Amino acid sequence: MEKKKVVLAYSGGLDTSVAIKWLQEKNYDIIALCLDLGEGKDLAFVKEKALSVGAIKSYMIDVQEEFANEYALMAMQAHTLYEGKYPLVSALSRPLIAKKLVEIAEQEGATAVAHGCTGKGNDQVRFEVSIQALNPYLEVIAPVREWKWSREEEIAYAKENDVPIPINLDSPFSIDQNLWGRSNECGILEDPWAAPPEDAYEMTLALEDTPNKPEFVEIGFEAGVPTTLNGTAYPLSELIKTLNALAGKHGVGRIDHVENRLVGIKSREVYECPAAMTLITAHKELEDLTLVKEVAHFKPMIEQKITELIYNGLWFSPLKQALNAFLQETQKNVTGMVRVKLFKGHAIVEGRKSEYSLYDEKLATYTAQDEFNHDAAVGFISLFGLPTKVYSQVNQKKVEA
């Protein structure tokens, strides 16, 4: 019987390495796909490992700039903070991984794609809903969800089938990382009362170890896109990396969050997002300077919905695409410079300027240069308060009667 082809999202870890052998037993030829999202792994090694374990072909694709410009940028412009805290580090990468899985599957004539998610996480939903949106005819296989092995059983299977066991297997943590940040769960972090140990962090310094002098960074934006740091232009992926190092050195972007997962459970995770939190903070301040009040007050409602859609795996949904159009319209005048102070875990905006600034000092000042028409206030107050005044008059008459 002719073997079918499956494209596997491959990380190089135990789960997806074992999945190669498991899928072979199901009569599949496996094509491994590894994406460089800026996590800092030796991906050339990962690519070769897939072949050594049994994949017939192995892809390694650098998608850092695509991830930065088409995913992280949109999240920054929408100030996406799930439950007010989490900047969607892992959730942002899943639709891009799904997109590349589908592209390679179609290119290779594969009938299925596979991922290494468990049956209790959000990522299985994000992958599978995204894949269905892009190609509803592809079969989706989730080996880890299907085999339901304990860690000990999985290791035993790996040893029986000569699957290399990672040297960091004893680490209690489950880590996911990309340009936008780093997420960490499991081990002692499963106790919401326990303080995260320092070895749970990698991108940021503990406050005790951060510099005792602040560092200032000027971030330049053009139409909502961060383009410069301290006057130096960068491709967006490099700007994010550079800012991760700058802000991380000052302990910016540590987040300890008990979140409500899509699958109905609560999960305690620790995130490090130095660049993400700094950029979101700076971008919001520039919007405050350049957006009219009505847009500035309405946009957070759209941001909340976009955040939920991304977290819930609905990146490719019709509603998400419609909300994108609103978001892009709001960014046309978000051009300017924001000065941020990085100090002891904080990214503090201390200055902002823009050629599209709607702040008029002559209208805002209380000095002799004031040009605000104070006399106009009387008529404005009369008309603005008229509905309230009429309501009060009518109801007081009823009480008196």
Swiss-Prot record:
Taxonomy of the source species: Bacteria, Bacillati, Bacillota, Bacilli, Bacillales
Signal peptide: none
Residues that bind ATP: A9, Y10, S11, G12, G13, L14, D15, T16, S17, G116
Annotated positions binding L-citrulline: Y86, N122, R126, S174, S183, E259, Y271
Organism expressing this protein natively: Bacillus cereus (strain ATCC 10987 / NRS 248)
Name of the protein described by the UniProt record: Argininosuccinate synthase
GO cellular component, one term: cytoplasm
Keyword Ligase: yes
Pathway assigned in UniProt: Amino-acid biosynthesis; L-arginine biosynthesis; L-arginine from L-ornithine and carbamoyl phosphate: step 2/3
NCBIfam families named among the record's database cross-references: argG (TIGR00032), PRK00509.1 (NF001770)
InterPro entries: Arginosuc_syn_C, Arginosuc_syn_N, Arginosuc_synth, Arginosuc_synth_CS, Arginosuc_synth_type_1_subfam, AS_cat/multimer_dom_body, Rossmann-like_a/b/a_fold
PANTHER family, alphabetized: ARGININOSUCCINATE SYNTHASE (PTHR11587:SF2)
Binding site for L-aspartate: T118, N122, D123
